[in-house]
Amino acid sequence: MEQEPAEDAQPDPSEGNLDEEDNSEVSSESQKGPEEVKKKIPETFFYTYEDVYSGPYATDDFEISTDLLIFKHSFGYDCTRPVNLMMMDGHTVGYIAGNQVVLQNLRTKTQKYIRSSRGSGIGFITAHPSKEYFAVGEKGKKPNIVIYTYPSLRPYRILKGGTEVAYVFGDFNRTGTLLASVGSSPDYMLTIWDWKQEETLLRSKAFAQDVYKVMFSAENEEHLTTSGSGHIRFWKMALTLTGLKLQGALGRFGKTAVSDITSFVELPDGKVVSGTEWGNLLLWEGGLIKVELCQVGRKPCHEGPVSQLVFDEGELYSVGKDGVIRMWNFEVVDTADHVDDTGLVEMEPMNELWLGKNVSLNFMTKILDHDQPFWYAQDTSGAIWKLDLTFSNMTHNPERVCTFHSGRIEAIGVSPFTCLMATTALDRSVRIYDFGSNSQLSVIKFNQGGTALTWAPAVVNPEGGLIAVGFEDGLVRIIEVYDPKLLPNCEGQAKETAEINLKQVFKPHAAAVTALAYEQKGDVFATGSKDKTVFFFTVEDEYKPIGFICVPGPVQALQWSPPSHDKSTLLILCENGFAVQVPAPLPGKQDTVTTYHIKNLPTQYFHFYSIKSRIKLEEEIARREKEKQEKEKARLEWIKQQREMGLEVEETEEEEPEEEPLPPIYIPEEPSPILCGFYSAPGKFWLSLGGYDSGFLYHCEFSHDNEEDPENRKDEPFDVIPMEDTNDNPIHQISFCTNNPLMFCGMQDGSLRAYPLSVKDLSVGVLKDYWYMNVHDNDNGQIRGICCSHDERCLITCGGDGNIFTFDLWSEEEIPEKLPKELKVIIPPPRSGLEKEKATEDIKGPDAHT
């Protein structure tokens, strides 16, 4: 039975709050009169997904189809979230990816997606003990918890009113009848739900600081524990004369140092074991620390924070950020008693599993696969592991079932010929993906994190296998992707579909490389850095330095002029409000005898001077003038009506009320950061800024007066376009699609916009209507890269939340006849003679010469 959401299916939870001193709340159900008790929601009631999910939106859906972009695949994993993993069966893993929950089949690698209901992000996911349901706790103003059935993925229940801004954690009790949720700032609300009836049973403020976790006791379902920043709290659901109450007792650290607590578990007898930031375990009884547990020799139980504690089938497991899982003797822990004033008790683990030095575990969950128990673990270094914790001679080895980038994606590039893309991140890896078959093909790791990346155009490398990558230590590496099966004498021997080879490495900068760009003819390669320099190289088989120039600020972006411009120039955008333009330097023509510093390159500067305050002032003056005119028009109309009725009206001027003073012109002390920009014509360019000056696209032009010190310049844009809803949500990335003219904007809040371009030149009218969708995480998913595939069939975005998404720009019916219906990758062939070359010697030390 499937229905539209019914009024009587919606809860009306109490909005009552609690003082910190009175930490109990009476059940809302017990306070209702008989006439107030709601009708029971039938077991067979379902919502329709189309009514629940947050889809794309168009400001004018007559002109812009909401199917302009179709979500295709998720390549990333937000592995640095505290808990972002659930197992629904032996081969299906679920995790949050921006505004989607991804359910991935580990065998077939296929994915299913569930969108958030509000488009404001997702705070937690948790599976029901039966695996027949899972809960999705969302973010945003008065967010929902949506319960879905599995495997049908139908929305079953929607819980409302449990927190103000975001849910951070949720847990079902052992029998699955109740759900506990906890919210973020400002309310930190703990709510106990009768989730099948969408009813709030109990609620209380959990604490006055960040709460990380809530969990029911496995043995006593009337007990719960919450923990977080500098605290742990023990809760009981108690039946009193006035009804069911939630009573909380704050744990007291006593002589033990206060710790943030991310992990705990209640033992069968009611004691609680928690982790600490320094790696030891604390045994709590009656709200007090009974003992602190460490290893023999006063070694901590883990090197670093304990991220999870699990009590399973009589065994106690601790999971550490150090990549180790240890199994402890439950009896020893439960009966531990202090022997001296230190309060420390030493013990040895019964068994342990160390996954490696570059592994950092956040969470693990158990699933039965063909009646065999396996654990799946979330590794914040960018992996999901399958583990066997039976610790016997038949135990399976740990298996990495998926690998990903760890942390935000810094840069992305696409092949000029085929459906290959490359990404890099501060996790020190470069990854190659086939976005036709939705698969990761190859990974190469280096000593420092990647910060910039560009795929060499066809004019530079006709095979399409060359990629330039910049790193946080100022290095630039030229790598090549090739099909190893095409190497001489390697038929059938290659394990990988694509391999990556380091071709060249050089260090042009003393700080992180932030931008890389090839000149349109492919003769010159430019690199920009936080060290306020731009370095130029000649593009040959081996890149050779031409020299560098100094610029007024850390480099944010580089863009060479398009082929339509008469002269080849480089637009250099600096973080601190400067734009610089230089011609392409000619190799051998620069005065770089003693150093590589180019001092005679003609340079034009633009130092952005804020005009937003003046725009706002002009808008306010215009608003007041319009208001006056409307009032005068209404007055004259009234006089006319009175006279038509034969009444005498004295036509006197109304006394003007005293106006509020106009706001003063404001110029921010700190210059607003330039986020992105692009050429519009020779010497002209558009800018998007953050900070105070967000909210507009600014059209700017280099002047020919360059005698003045750049620092003293005050250059104003000559035109502006107000961009709707961007005052607090600036545009960070802009990219264009030419076949179906579109301008794509990647926003700070992780949303994606597409503006149809009816004419070449941008204007207020052209950028009035747009398509948008919240795709990346709203809080930390700022879009850091957008690019179209070589044939403009796909759009790819990457974000600060570690996610990489692909979208289809055409449906199957819309694909032009000249293009194949299916995307099939063609891996570039290896360079002739590659198999005979010695491996390129990498630069490994951070102190290498610039």
Predicted features along the sequence, with ranges:
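Beta-strand-rich domains and repeat architectures in extracellular enzymes and scaffolds
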Residues: 72-100, 121-123
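Conserved strand-to-loop turn within each blade of WD40 beta-propeller repeats
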Residues: 137-141, 182-186, 226-229, 275-278, ...
